[in-house]
Amino acid sequence: MKELVRLFVQIALMRKGPQDLPASAALLAGTAAGYCIINCLISAVLPPIPGHWFGQLIVEIVFVFVWYALLLRVLNRPERFLQTTTAVFGYQAVLAPLWISAVWLVRQFSDDDTWRLPISMLGLAIVVWTVAANARVLKAALEWATPACVALVILQYLAGQILLLYLFSGML
């Protein structure tokens, strides 16, 4: 278990990739469950943010499964699904404490002119790091150039946000 956590940290730091993980459905399920549990624990520690965060988390997890299943099938790389998706959930589990804390800080201090810019910059740095880590995972899985992988990650993020907006705000 310790070695697996170290490996996910190395993936988050962009030193390793999905090819370093075993292709295991059980590991994928455990990693996705771990990602969910980490999100729940961090959200329980921080004062509550209004909204349907748990429902959004479940939709996000299902979306990641569907996104990578379809993407890798369309691009004729379905055999890389287990390792790629495990790597994505693994590095996201590592970065989740930073990301959730940054989102919480942005929401808490959105009206405070003193803290708005530094906290927004922190959030932006985490988003950029997340995109870079995910693009590196995709680059290993697809054997594409980095800019194309960055574009795919941004497309995934936008599609996921549109789905969440549609399901939870009723705006679309």
How should each PLM-predicted stretch be described?
Residues S43-I49, L105-D112, L172:
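Helix-coil boundary and interhelical linker segments in multi-pass alpha-helical membrane proteins
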Residues R77-L155, A159, L163:
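Hydrophobic alpha-helical transmembrane segments and adjacent short intramembrane/lumenal linkers
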